[in-house]
């Protein structure tokens, strides 16, 4: 869009605004699909953080909030229809201008560069744009930070970078002094990262990508003196010489304010969340009723890491694919601690006709090769190291880890970053205080500014959380000593039950697990020990290695998992169920009730958050959900899509009914 056209569009609106409320804008282009044509809509992200949803109706953008964003539509013939898009970007508190431009699919960052040409009165700055290029490093010699935005068009490449906790450019590993920020944005098939390279003469090394998989936009953050941007591009140096006129300041995040957050629980949920929050600069205090981390459901010797996939592209799949890939890197990032693990892969086979049909449905979908691949019987035998003689689905990046040791490692790592831990603290109740929450314990009271409950199966023991729609499931895991051909097993087997390779630290395997609803006892049960053995015999009948499964020593461990109705975890603000019921009684259900709940936020307990319901796949999902919850508490965009985050909302069970006008049970 030319400067003259832009001025014609902006001036009539700018002239009506008081100067103090004209906000500096930074524009991201989101493609809208209308029929067979793609359009792009730039939206703004100034300083004030406000999450919600934008509805586009007849040329006006209205966030569902107390703030209003004015929308100027220069092409009403293209956008007369109603549209909506999820929004987790900051919105301004005062009036602002949004340009809405319709173009026939140019490269995404050409749009972004064009959007920067807003007002020629701003200082001239340099920018560089590289499309479909293999970039190995970026370095700058400017005196002020450099903003780097990377568009990754291949999901596997995205996961290789964005989900790698050890990679210097990962949003989860921004400890290097010269790299700051780090947010991941995702819409449809486009994913991109945004971060800052802060210190001059410092280089940021990128992974080598296929040239068709990445676009990079590099531009100054603020005013630069003698900006010089250099990209190492396929062995040659490219100097960015395009000079669009850009605003003098492009804030895309609100100023960071450290928060004082208390966590109750030291299992996978609490330990990983503590680490995620500390990495973002918050003050974290952890309380646990047990004497050490990982005593509850997270206390098993070995636990399998593999995704919970479905044939549909539903919330479970969209959660577990990235969560599974990140879990591996999370574990590996703690490998310098005493931590038994082995990413030897997970082989899933059918144990009956129904299970086999389900695996076939899973394999009918195309998965990234890093996630899941089909294997035949011969390949399965080679992968397992023992006779399987049936095909299935193989998760090459799966494996096992000691959950108890993982919790210990995460806590020890968090202590190096300032975590304050208090064990043997039994919290009997919590009450709202003037500046947060008061925790009532067996020895006295503790004040907390903000509170996250990650207490496993005890989550429903408090008055504020007793109505959460979670159910406890007892699970007993059998310990099997290594004998005979069991030593040859090279991968985790998963069928009617699961069986792990030998753990060198204990000299045994884990086999399990029972699944008893509503039972919170952790006592040993011989019946469940026999059931675990029978499941493995049923899964691999007649195989000689199964004969070496010995449970005669009666060694096992039982834990209690918390599971939701839809098998999705819960992470987010704690719902105020009493207030929801009060509003429901006043409004009723039906069309009137549906309309109300579609436009009003459900009540929550201020400053109180839930992290629970990880079920039997907490090792696979917990670390990434912790990252997303930490992002939400930090006022930054979570890695997961907005609708997936909504699906994790502890309020979801009630809201699904209320938004449809259905009666509550």
Curated annotation (Swiss-Prot):
Any single Gene Ontology cellular-component annotation: cytoplasm
GO molecular-function term, one example from the UniProt record: flavin adenine dinucleotide binding
Annotated segments matching region tRNA (mnm(5)s(2)U34)-methyltransferase: 1-243
InterPro entries in the record: FAD-dep_OxRdtase, FAD/NAD-bd_sf, tRNA_MAMT_biosynth_bifunc_MnmC, tRNA_S-uridine_synth_MnmC_C
Predominant subcellular localization, coarse grouping: cytoplasm
Keyword Cytoplasm among UniProt keywords: yes
Pfam families recorded: DAO
The name this protein goes by in its record: tRNA 5-methylaminomethyl-2-thiouridine biosynthesis bifunctional protein MnmC
Record gene name: mnmC
């Amino acid at each position: 869009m030319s400067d003259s056209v832009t001025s014609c569009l902006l001036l009539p609106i700018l002239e009506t605004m008081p100067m103090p409320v004209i906000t500096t804008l930074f524009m991201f282009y989101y493609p809208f699909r209308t029929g067979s044509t793609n359009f792009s809509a730039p939206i703004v992200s100034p300083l004030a953080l406000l999450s919600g949803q934008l509805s586009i109706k007849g040329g006006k953008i209205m966030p569902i909030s107390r703030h209003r964003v004015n929308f100027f539509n220069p092409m009403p013939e293209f956008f007369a229809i109603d549209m909506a898009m999820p929004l987790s970007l900051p919105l301004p508190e005062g009036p602002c201008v949004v340009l809405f431009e319709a173009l026939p699919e140019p490269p995404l960052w050409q749009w972004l560069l064009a959007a920067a040409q807003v007002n020629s009165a701003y200082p001239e700055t340099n920018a560089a744009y590289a499309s479909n290029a293999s970039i190995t490093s970026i370095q700058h010699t400017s005196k002020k930070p450099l903003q780097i935005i990377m568009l990754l068009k291949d999901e596997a490449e995205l996961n290789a970078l964005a989900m790698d906790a050890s990679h210097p450019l990962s949003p989860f590993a921004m400890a290097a002094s010269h790299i700051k920020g780090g947010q991941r944005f995702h819409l449809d098939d486009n994913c991109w990262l945004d971060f800052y390279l802060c210190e001059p003469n410092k280089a940021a090394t990128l992974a080598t990508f296929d040239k068709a998989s990445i676009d990079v936009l590099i531009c100054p953050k603020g005013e630069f003196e003698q900006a010089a941007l250099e990209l190492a591009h396929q062995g040659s140096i490219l100097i960015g010489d395009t000079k669009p006129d850009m605003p003098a300041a492009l804030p895309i995040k609100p100023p960071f304010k450290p928060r004082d957050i208390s966590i109750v629980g030291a299992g996978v949920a609490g330990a990983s969340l503590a680490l995620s929050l500390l990495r973002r600069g918050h003050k974290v205090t952890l309380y646990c009723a047990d004497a050490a981390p990982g005593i509850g459901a997270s206390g098993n010797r070995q636990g399998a890491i593999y995704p919970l996939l479905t044939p549909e592209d539903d919330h479970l799949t969209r959660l577990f694919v990235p969560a599974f890939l990140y879990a591996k890197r999370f574990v590996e990032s703690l490998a310098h601690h005493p931590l038994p693990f082995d990413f030897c892969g997970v082989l899933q086979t059918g144990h009956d006709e129904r299970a086999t049909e389900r695996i076939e449905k899973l394999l009918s979908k195309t998965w990234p090769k890093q996630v899941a691949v089909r294997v035949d019987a011969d390949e399965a035998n080679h992968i397992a190291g023992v006779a399987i003689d049936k095909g299935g689905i193989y998760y090459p990046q799966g494996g096992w880890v000691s959950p108890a040791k993982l919790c210990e490692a995460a806590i020890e790592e968090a202590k190096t970053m300032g975590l304050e831990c208090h064990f043997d603290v039994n919290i009997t109740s919590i009450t709202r205080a003037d500046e947060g929450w008061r925790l009532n314990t067996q020895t006295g009271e503790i004040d907390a500014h903000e509170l996250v409950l990650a207490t496993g199966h005890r989550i429903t023991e408090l008055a504020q959380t007793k109505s959460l729609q979670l159910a406890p499931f007892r699970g007993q895991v059998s310990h099997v000593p290594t004998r005979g051909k069991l030593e040859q097993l090279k991968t985790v087997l998963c069928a009617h039950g699961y069986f792990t390779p030998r753990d060198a630290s204990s000299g045994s395997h884990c086999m399990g697990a029972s699944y008893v609803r509503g039972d919170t006892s952790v006592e040993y049960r011989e019946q469940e020990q026999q059931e675990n053995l029978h499941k493995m015999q049923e899964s691999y009948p007649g195989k000689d290695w199964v004969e070496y499964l010995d449970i005669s020593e009666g060694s096992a461990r039982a834990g209690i998992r918390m599971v939701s109705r839809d098998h999705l975890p819960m992470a987010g603000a704690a719902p105020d169920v009493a207030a929801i019921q009060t509003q429901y009684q006043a409004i009723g259900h039906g069309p009137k009730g549906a309309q109300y709940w579609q436009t009003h936020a459900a009540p929550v307990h201020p400053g109180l958050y839930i992290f629970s319901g990880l079920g039997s796949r907490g090792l696979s999902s917990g670390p990434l959900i912790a990252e997303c919850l930490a992002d939400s508490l930090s006022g930054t965009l979570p890695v997961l899509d907005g609708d997936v985050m909504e699906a994790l909302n502890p309020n979801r069970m009630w809201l699904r009914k209320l938004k449809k006008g259905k009666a509550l049970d």
